[in-house]
Amino acid sequence: MSLIHINILMAFTMSLVGLLMYRSHLMSALLCLEGMVLSLFILMTLTILNSHFTLANMVPIILLVFAACEAAIGLALLVMVSNTYGTDYVQNLNLLQC
């Protein structure tokens, strides 16, 4: 395994640990999720380029589309929670149920 792959896996692991440690605030959780998706995107792109598998060239773009949707939904949730309660605690998400 090359040094680039190890660095990308370390970035994914650090984002996962950050998500587990700083899960009380929604903004921190969203940033950690974005870091995880970005490292997965880079790892997937490098793997596809190194394997010369031309049929899978669209997979990283599909992952970016899902990441953009996740970011938009996460920011909408963050705005709704912060406007309603004045804080961005994840525990306030349970109070948004009907």
From Swiss-Prot:
Principal localisation: mitochondrion
Catalytic activity: a ubiquinone + NADH + 5 H(+)(in) = a ubiquinol + NAD(+) + 4 H(+)(out)
Source organism, top-level taxon: Eukaryota
Membrane spanning residue stretches: 1-21, 29-49, 61-81
Gene Ontology cellular-component annotations: mitochondrial inner membrane; respiratory chain complex I
Function text: Core subunit of the mitochondrial membrane respiratory chain NADH dehydrogenase (Complex I) which catalyzes electron transfer from NADH through the respiratory chain, using ubiquinone as an electron acceptor. Part of the enzyme membrane arm which is embedded in the lipid bilayer and involved in proton translocation.
Subcellular location: Mitochondrion inner membrane
Top-rank EC class of the record's enzyme: translocase
Pfam family, one: Oxidored_q2
Protein's UniProt name: NADH-ubiquinone oxidoreductase chain 4L
PANTHER family tied to this protein: NADH-UBIQUINONE OXIDOREDUCTASE CHAIN 4L, NADH-UBIQUINONE OXIDOREDUCTASE SUBUNIT ND4L
Family membership: Belongs to the complex I subunit 4L family.
E.C. number: 7.1.1.2
Quaternary structure annotation from Swiss-Prot or TrEMBL: Core subunit of respiratory chain NADH dehydrogenase (Complex I) which is composed of 45 different subunits.
Keyword set includes Repeat: no
Mode of membrane association: Multi-pass membrane protein
GO molecular function: NADH dehydrogenase (ubiquinone) activity
Keywords carried by this UniProt record: Electron transport, Membrane, Mitochondrion, Mitochondrion inner membrane, NAD, Respiratory chain, Translocase, Transmembrane, Transmembrane helix, Transport, Ubiquinone
GO biological process terms on file: ATP synthesis coupled electron transport
